[in-house]
Amino acid sequence: MIQVPSRSELNAWILAVAAMTALSAFSVFAAGADLFGVDIARSFGWWSFAVSAAVLVTVLGLVAIFNPRWPIDHQATALVAAALSWPVFWVLRTNWLNADGNMLTPKLEADVPRVGAHLTHDELLELFFHSRLWYYTHQWWGWSVVHAYQVASCTAGAVFIYVLIRLTRRVAQPAPWLFVAGVLAGGYMQLFFGDVENYTITAAIVAFYVLAACRFLEGEVALWVPATALAIAAGFHLEAAWLWPSALYLAFISHRRRGDRSEAIAAAGAACTILAATFLYFQFHGLPLMRFFSSHAGHALRMNGVFAIGMPLRYYLDQLDLFLLLSPAVLMAIPLSIWRRYGRDEITVFLGVSAASMLLLQVIWRSQIGVLDDWNLYSLGGLLTSLFLWRAIAGAVRTRGFQLTAAACAAVAWLHSYSWIVMNHLHGR
C-alpha cells in the first residue's frame, strides 16, 4: 500500500535539503579548497556563480513544476544525448592529476615500449587498454599519455550518459527528468571530465551491468548477460568484484523464479571463464600470476595493510567529506527511510545491495595516497548510492511541493559538484 504524502514528510524533505545546503556552504565559505570543497571565488567568480545558480534553479524548477513524463529512453534520444555530452566533458576536462595520475606517464612510457603495456592485476584491462591506446595514438598523432587518458575518460562519459537515459524507464518512470538531473549531480561525474586514472571505463561498464541487471529482473534477458558484464568490469578493475553480492542476489531471483540453479550455474560459469581467460592470457603476455600476490588484491587476501582499521579521526572525517561530495543527496536517505519510500521490488533491492557493497569498500578499504587524492577509488559507491536514492526520490514526488523540493536538492548538488569540476578544470591557470 502506497503511503499518502503528508505535510510532515514534506517538511522533513525541506529540512534535509536545508542541511545539505548548509554542509555545502560550510565547505565553500568556511573552509574553501582546504576541505576538498570548492572555492567559488576561484572557480567562477561571484557573478558567474550567481548567474549559473539562477539559470540552474530556474530550469530545474520548471522541470519540477511541469514534470514532463514523455519517454526519453528511446535509442535515438540516448545516442544523441551521448554524442552531445562528449564535447561538454572535453571542454571542461580536468587539469588536476592526483598522485597516481602523475605516475602513469613515466610508467607507460617505460613499460609500453619494453613489454607492450604497463600491467597490474588490480586494474588489468584498464591499464592494458590505456597502454595500447596511448601506443597507437602516440605513433599516429603524437598524443601524450594524459591526452589519451582524457579522450578515453570523456568517451566513457558519453557511454554512461547513453546507459543512464536507457535506464530511466526501468528505474524512474514517475519522474524521469528528475532522476537524470539528480544522478548527473554527483561528484563522481568528475570521472568523465578527463580524469587520468583507471576507473573511468570500469564505471561505464558497471553502468551497463546495472542496465543488464534491470533487464534481467524484468524478464528481458537471461542471467548470463549481467553476469558477463560484471565479469568484464572486474577484468578491467578488480574493484568491481565488490559487486558480487548484487550478482548473488540476481542468482537468488533466478532460482526463485525457475525452481533450480541451472541458470545461475551457467551464468557463474560464463563469468568465471571470462576472468580466468583474462588472467591466463596475461600469464603469457607480461603479467605472471605470481605477481598477483604483490598487488593490492593480493595484500587483501593476506590481510596486509589495505584495511582502514585504527585510522586517525581525520581519515574518517575526510571519508565523510568525500562521500558528501560524491553523493550529495545522501541526507535525503533519512526522510526516505522514515516514510519507507524505497519500496521492496526487485530492482530497488538490487540497487540497494549494489550501493551497500561499494560503500562497504569505502568504509574498510584504506586509501594509499590519502582519501581526498583517492576520490576516484570510491566514486562507484557514490554513483550507485545516487542511483538508489534518486530512484526512491523520483517515485515519491507525488505533489508539487515534493517536486520543487527534489529539484532544489538536485540544484544544490549540481552547484557543489560542478563548482568542483570547474575548479579542477581551471587548476593551474
Predicted regions located by residue number:
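Extracytoplasmic catalytic/substrate-binding loops of multi-pass membrane glycan-assembly enzymes
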Residues: W90-L108, G116-L133, W143-H147
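Perimembrane helix-loop-helix junctions
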Residues: A212-E218, L243-T273, S337-R344
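Hydrophobic, aromatic-rich transmembrane alpha-helices
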Residues: T58-N67, Y162-I165, D318-D345
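Transmembrane-helix motifs of polytopic, lipid-linked glycan transferases
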Residues: V151-V171, F208
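Membrane-interface alpha helices of multi-pass inner-membrane proteins
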Residues: L223-L238, W244-Y249
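Membrane-lumen/periplasm interface segments of specific transmembrane helices
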Residues: F26, E263-L336, M358-Q362
